[in-house]
């Protein structure tokens, strides 16, 4: 028997609030073959992870801080500490955060370590690739725009908490004034960039303390050596107040890394030079009523 004129209204629709499988599938809301997906859309409180505190990105992956950069007559210097943190734990004490990306640019990384390191490495390959194809190197504004595009491409991850912000420093060969050719560029998570005009910049969790230090000491910058010293002083001040920034580690022999860029190109500063400067800074900052790092041991009868 057939029912050609069957009245579909005789079959009542689903009650208000009831789960409509066909409608859900048509909207791509739920996978009916997965019971967990069904629970996720209809009763998320029944899932085992429901109501439990989530793990923030800063607790799940290592983060690196802090980077400083200063301009001096004829060039620019960039330095970075060596600590990486994972939540409240120290993930690493000897992270490399300052990378030479070509003959006249250097990139410092802060934020999610894995993403930031890939930024620096990929950026170096991008600059080399362009030069091989075009036969000429990118201009400094072109280098800035290329790095900004890479940062903007990470916006989706940044919105989820995996932020990685580079700090770019370089020497602009097209500047007619060699004494003022040093450049420092900072970036935001959306790919916006700012050419620093004050002469110094810092990124990372300790940046507020590092910038305050550089603001007070920048008048002492006259050449590459004095700029390097101010950079190390700024990192020391940042480590003094920010637990995520690592200061000079005399016990393990771990010190900040630094790169100087002039018209002759980018040069990584020798570790021994930085170590000697760190020891001198610590000695000068030691209080008169305490024992300095190189103070002779005190005998019991001298107490």
Swiss-Prot record:
Positions of the propeptide segment: 1-64
Pfam short name (any one): Proteasome
Active site annotation, chain numbering: 65
CDD domains linked: proteasome_protease_HslV
Catalytic reaction list: Cleavage of peptide bonds with very broad specificity
One GO location term (cellular component): cytoplasm
Main localization (coarse): cytoplasm
Record's signal peptide: none
GO molecular function: threonine-type endopeptidase activity
Compartments (UniProt record): Cytoplasm
InterPro entries: Ntn_hydrolases_N (IPR029055), Proteasome_sua/b (IPR001353), Proteasome_suB-type (IPR023333), PSB_actinobac (IPR022483)
Keywords, alphabetical: Autocatalytic cleavage, Cytoplasm, Hydrolase, Protease, Proteasome, Threonine protease, Zymogen
Entry EC number(s): 3.4.25.1
Pathway where it operates: Protein degradation; proteasomal Pup-dependent pathway
PROSITE patterns with a match to the protein in the record: PROTEASOME_BETA_2
Coiled-coil residues: none
Any GO BP annotation: modification-dependent protein catabolic process
Family designation: Belongs to the peptidase T1B family.
Function: Component of the proteasome core, a large protease complex with broad specificity involved in protein degradation.
Quaternary structure note: The 20S proteasome core is composed of 14 alpha and 14 beta subunits that assemble into four stacked heptameric rings, resulting in a barrel-shaped structure. The two inner rings, each composed of seven catalytic beta subunits, are sandwiched by two outer rings, each composed of seven alpha subunits. The catalytic chamber with the active sites is on the inside of the barrel. Has a gated structure, the ends of the cylinder being occluded by the N-termini of the alpha-subunits. Is capped by the proteasome-associated ATPase, ARC.
Name the record gives this protein: Proteasome subunit beta
Taxonomic lineage of the native organism: Bacteria, Bacillati, Actinomycetota, Actinomycetes, Mycobacteriales
